[in-house]
Amino acid sequence: MANYFNTLNLRQQLAQLGKCRFMQRAEFADGCDVLKGKKVVIVGCGAQGLNQGLNMRDSGLDISYTLRKAAITEKRASWQKATDNGFAVGTYEELIPTADLVLNLTPDKQHSDVVKTVMPLMKQGAALGYSHGFNVVEEGQQIRADITVVMVAPKCPGTEVREEYKRGFGVPTLLAVHPENDPKGVGMAIAKAWASATGGDRAGVLESSFVAEVKSDLMGEQTILCGMLQAGSLLCYDKLVAEGTDPAYAGKLIQFGWETITEALKQGGISLMMDRLSNPAKLRAFELSEQLRTLMRPLFEKHMDDIIAGEFSRGMMADWAEDDAKLFGWREETGKSAFENALAFAGKIAEQEYFDNGVVMVAMVKAGVELAFETMVASGIYEESAYYESLHELPLIANTVARKRLYEMNVVISDTAEYGNYLFANAAVPLLREHFMPTLKAGDLGASKAEGQNVDNLALLAANEATRNHPIEKIGQVLRGYMKDMKRIAVGG
């Protein structure tokens, strides 16, 4: 199979990268009626599969799960989760021929085999759904001409999809129809109904394309969402311990610091996050972030270039063919890191202390969010998509670090995200260790006090204006208006 994006001409590539429209609430007035009375069969019962299915059933849809015969006979975890929640479970041969809509919610690595298996069993004119378009865009999966292909991609982990639905809300969502597979012109109606059934229409839905979703999703998760958190955690922990900080305190400051800092980011963007610092610390964080932006821009651009060209996907799929040898090796290295093995700190760290003692962490977040956003937009991705794939998702990923450090983050994210995370972090750590971490001063990280507390009013004014006038802050104000009811997600430190 050929990479679908690379088969398009430049005009088609730009058109699909730039497909982005914020849908009006009125467009979802019919809710999920289009799918009521239809049979929806979900392949896979992981975090997205289970939680989307629970929401869709609660919305009045007929939901069942299909699993491989071995998973059923051996009563594996996927079978256990589906049956424990009262869903009908059957083999591909039993359920796929009855389905009006088949949702492929398995891991990316399994998509090709799943589609090749279920496609011959699907009835004429049925629909196939994805929550991530890697199989279509990067693997170039060819799908039978009579099948409608749609995507609904919640911009949150599956657990949050469920929790927000239960409290009467939802999570921001992207939807798309594959232009090569909409034979009856019903793809948009199906995608809208699916998004509504999961609760996505209550928080805001972007009409996108498979291409835009995949390219922006890969970029966000590799850089700011996962790669920057991994690199920053390893570097900051090592720096603190090398300078005499109690390793247990250092571990807690980093583990819960990302979550606390990005909670402010979620509520009020980069501006609010920076406002949590004292004026001298804010100026220092701004200075450090500018230094990071200059140093790291080539790395961000390389990742975007490799994603656009398909080089990233080729490398990862080659590792699939080697039974994930690189992925498992990098995972093992992370598990042996000093940060991952730091003892728990019994004391309490006040919320403001995370900001006061984590000035460089604030700078890393600011620089990483802005760079990811700018790099995506420069590649033809619209600002709304770039916002969701950078700033919006960061607090959710930081929350996983707070639970069980980097191990939990890498377990929760997809195999695709984990592979890209390691690629980025493996380049970022030596770069920053050599050229950035030695430039830190007293007060940038940890409890040491900064020298001098004088503030230049004009410098502070310029820093505030530069932060607040960044394009991600402007689009963020609009999009956060649709999410103002989202609950705090912090697990606490």
UniProtKB/Swiss-Prot annotation:
Q: Name one GO cellular component term.
A: cytosol
Recorded protein name is Ketol-acid reductoisomerase (NADP(+))
Which residues are involved in binding Mg(2+) 1?
Answer: 217, 221
Annotated KARI N-terminal Rossmann domain residues:
15-208
* Domain KARI C-terminal knotted span(s) in chain numbering: 209-344, 345-486
Any Pfam family matching the protein: KARI_N
Residues reported in the UniProt entry to bind substrate: 414
Reactions catalysed according to its record: (2R)-2,3-dihydroxy-3-methylbutanoate + NADP(+) = (2S)-2-acetolactate + NADPH + H(+); (2R,3R)-2,3-dihydroxy-3-methylpentanoate + NADP(+) = (S)-2-ethyl-2-hydroxy-3-oxobutanoate + NADPH + H(+)
Obligatory cofactor(s):
Mg(2+)
Enzyme Commission number(s) of this protein:
1.1.1.86
Task: Name the pathway.
Answer: Amino-acid biosynthesis; L-isoleucine biosynthesis; L-isoleucine from 2-oxobutanoate: step 2/4; Amino-acid biosynthesis; L-valine biosynthesis; L-valine from pyruvate: step 2/4
On cofactor binding, the record's note says: Binds 2 magnesium ions per subunit.
Q: Which family does it belong to?
A: Belongs to the ketol-acid reductoisomerase family.
Give the originating organism: Aeromonas salmonicida (strain A449)
| Matching SUPFAM superfamilies | 6-phosphogluconate dehydrogenase C-terminal domain-like, NAD(P)-binding Rossmann-fold domains
The active site of this protein is located at 132
Name the NCBIfam families for this protein: ilvC, PRK05225.1
Q: Which parts of the sequence bind NADP(+)?
A: 45-48, 68, 76, 78, 108-110, 158
Q: Which UniProt keywords apply?
A: Amino-acid biosynthesis, Branched-chain amino acid biosynthesis, Magnesium, Metal-binding, NADP, Oxidoreductase, Repeat
Q: What does this protein do?
A: Involved in the biosynthesis of branched-chain amino acids (BCAA). Catalyzes an alkyl-migration followed by a ketol-acid reduction of (S)-2-acetolactate (S2AL) to yield (R)-2,3-dihydroxy-isovalerate. In the isomerase reaction, S2AL is rearranged via a Mg-dependent methyl migration to produce 3-hydroxy-3-methyl-2-ketobutyrate (HMKB). In the reductase reaction, this 2-ketoacid undergoes a metal-dependent reduction by NADPH to yield (R)-2,3-dihydroxy-isovalerate.
Q: Which residues bind Mg(2+) 2?
A: 217, 389, 393
The UniProt GO MF terms for this protein read: ketol-acid reductoisomerase activity; magnesium ion binding
Which superkingdom does the taxonomy of this entry point to? Answer: Bacteria
Q: Which GO terms describe its biological process?
A: isoleucine biosynthetic process; L-valine biosynthetic process
